[in-house]
Amino acid sequence: MTKKTKPESYAFSQNFPISADKARRVIDRIRGRSYEETLIILELLPYRAAYPILKFVCFAASNASSTSTSKKENLFISKAEVNERPAIKKLKPRARGRSFPIKKATCHITIVLTDLSFYFNELVEPQQEKNLLTKLYLNLRGLWDKK
C-alpha cells in the first residue's frame, strides 16, 4: 500500500444563506455515515439545505481523491458541524419613504471526510479488506450515530 499523508479531507462553507437550525436538521442525518450512504440520503431528503450540503460532501470527496490515493467507497463523514453566524441586516424600501428591516440568517458549515483504509498497515485480500472496512466503520460509529 502507498503511504498517505492525511486520512482526512475538508469542505468549508462560510456565510451560507440558510438558518443554522434548518442546516442542522440535514447534517444530523448524515453525521457518521459512509460517503455512498450519505449521497443516497441527501438525494432523497425534501429539505432546501440538502442539495448544497450534497455539493459540499462531493467537494470533500474530490479533495480526498485529488490529494491522496483514497477511494470514495472507503470514505465516511467523521465530522459535520453547523455554526451560527450573525444575521445579515438589510432595509427593504416601502411606501411613503419608509423602510422595514430584514434579518437574513446565515451559518458556517464544516464537513470532514476520513479515509478508513488509512488505518490498515498490511496489504490484505480484496474480500478481507471489504470485511475489515465494514467492521472498522461499524466500530467507529458505535452505538449512537447522531453525534
From Swiss-Prot:
It comes from the Eukaryota. The keyword Cell division does not apply. The keyword Transferase does not apply. Part of the 50S ribosomal subunit. SUPFAM superfamilies: Ribosomal protein L22 (SSF54843). InterPro entries: Ribosomal_uL22 (IPR001063), Ribosomal_uL22_bac/chlpt-type (IPR005727), Ribosomal_uL22_bac/org-type (IPR047867), Ribosomal_uL22_CS (IPR018260), Ribosomal_uL22_sf (IPR036394). This is Large ribosomal subunit protein uL22c. HAMAP family: Ribosomal_uL22_B. Signal peptide: none annotated. Belongs to the universal ribosomal protein uL22 family. Keywords: Plastid, Ribonucleoprotein, Ribosomal protein, RNA-binding, rRNA-binding. It is found in: Plastid. NCBIfam families: rplV_bact. This protein binds specifically to 23S rRNA. The globular domain of the protein is located near the polypeptide exit tunnel on the outside of the subunit, while an extended beta-hairpin is found that lines the wall of the exit tunnel in the center of the 70S ribosome. GO terms for cellular component: large ribosomal subunit; plastid. It comes from Cuscuta obtusiflora. Transmembrane segments: none annotated.
